[in-house]
Amino acid sequence: MSRRYFGTDGIRGRANGLITPELALKVGQAAGLVFQRGDHRHRVVIGKDTRLSGYMIENAMVAGFTSVGMDVLLVGPMPTPAVAMLTKSMRADLGVMISASHNMFEDNGIKLFGPLGFKLSDDVEKQIEQLLDEPMDKKLSESASLGRARRIDGVHDRYIEFAKRTLPRDLSLDGLRVVVDCANGAAYKVVPEALWELGADVISIGVEPDGFNINKECGSTSPEALCRKVREMRADIGIALDGDADRVIMVDERGHVIDGDQLLAVIAQSWKEDGRLARPGIVATVMSNLGLERFLASEGIELVRTSVGDRYVLEAMLRDGYNVGGEASGHIILSDYATTGDGFVAALQILAVVQKLGRPVSEVCHRFDPLPQILKNVRYRAGRPLDDAGVQSAISDAEKRLNGHGRLLIRPSGTEPVIRVMGEGEDRIMVEEVVDTIVDALGNASAAAA
């Protein structure tokens, strides 16, 4: 069965476009029915980020879940990994995060977690999709069996304590000046507080959400403001989270960006030295730079690659017994601590290495020289541009030109109508030329189909 709603990271789209109150209500009903297993009273944890449409979707989902007899625990704006953690901690049957992650406020989405805090499998998502297209009137609970909803206090402190416990008890961030950019998103309350409790000198930006400014010129996808602030405040390091705090990008004392590949290199090498790697390898995606792979090989660490998407990274980690994985975009999964990507917990591991080594972040976090990599996005309105004959010809010509001295990766986004074109190789000029040729062909195909 083709998937109409679920992409690589839940359901995502324009608020009041794809993501309507009607859809949110039905997702609540369908997911509630799928997860009513056993004879106990069933519960769902619902969190959200700070975008305006979160109120609308939250209320619709509460109506959906309670209409099929599920109790709802509302935790308000919280990071996605916090919702996953709370789902397991509070013995809930299901967790929901209302967020479109790094997208702008106009979009929103619904991410679902099972009772152990893991994202749902494809099979479970298909079960929910099937119910979305069925009438619900005969599946609703009797009046006496309807669910209840309540807001839960103290959840911020729970997540702060959870994050702090990922560091050794005797490790302090005293003496470290940290600028943190919370993207005006879900982490704006918890992360600055946690850093302060750990002893850091904290300077916060992106902590004034108004419903519209999430990810707007801030956060992990727009680190320029953080780079400027780090230089201005002469900070030791900067941390940029995205809107739901499941990814992180960092900045060194010079204001230079440290991407997810460099963060993976730091954590992998440090954990290997400390005997903390479950296996002599880590998991990343096909988007990770070849420079990372070469560096890890020199350290005796294997790089296992998956398709793009943190869910595929986690699947490989769980299947093959790895405990470190991630993406260049900043999704870092440390399965000793979390069931999903946790930007703040990953950042804490980097801060721990910085404190341990006592060296500038620019030295600690530059483990390899990345090969030139060009990534461009082509947005399209209709059709299947990748099937166009002109596009296929451009791709074939580009591969011949690279002739084994680089690689191409061309794929549709799983969350939006965008085709991502990535080229990588030792000759930057050649890589730029072949990527631009493919981008032009895709643009022409998209225009012809519109």
Swiss-Prot record:
Q: How is it modified after translation?
A: Activated by phosphorylation.
Q: Tell me which Pfam families the record gives.
A: PGM_PMM_I (PF02878), PGM_PMM_II (PF02879), PGM_PMM_III (PF02880), PGM_PMM_IV (PF00408)
Cofactor requirements of the protein: Mg(2+)
GO biological process, alphabetically ordered: carbohydrate metabolic process; peptidoglycan biosynthetic process; UDP-N-acetylglucosamine biosynthetic process
Name the Enzyme Commission number(s) assigned to this protein: 5.4.2.10
* Reactions listed under catalytic activity: alpha-D-glucosamine 1-phosphate = D-glucosamine 6-phosphate
Is the Magnesium keyword given for this protein?
Answer: yes
Q: What is the recorded function of this protein according to its Swiss-Prot or TrEMBL entry?
A: Catalyzes the conversion of glucosamine-6-phosphate to glucosamine-1-phosphate.
Q: NCBIfam families of this UniProt entry?
A: glmM (TIGR01455), PRK10887.1 (NF008139)
> Of which family is this protein a member?
Belongs to the phosphohexose mutase family.
Entry protein name = Phosphoglucosamine mutase
* Organism of provenance: Rhodopseudomonas palustris (strain HaA2)
Q: What is the lineage of its organism?
A: Bacteria, Pseudomonadati, Pseudomonadota, Alphaproteobacteria, Hyphomicrobiales
Give me the gene this protein comes from: glmM
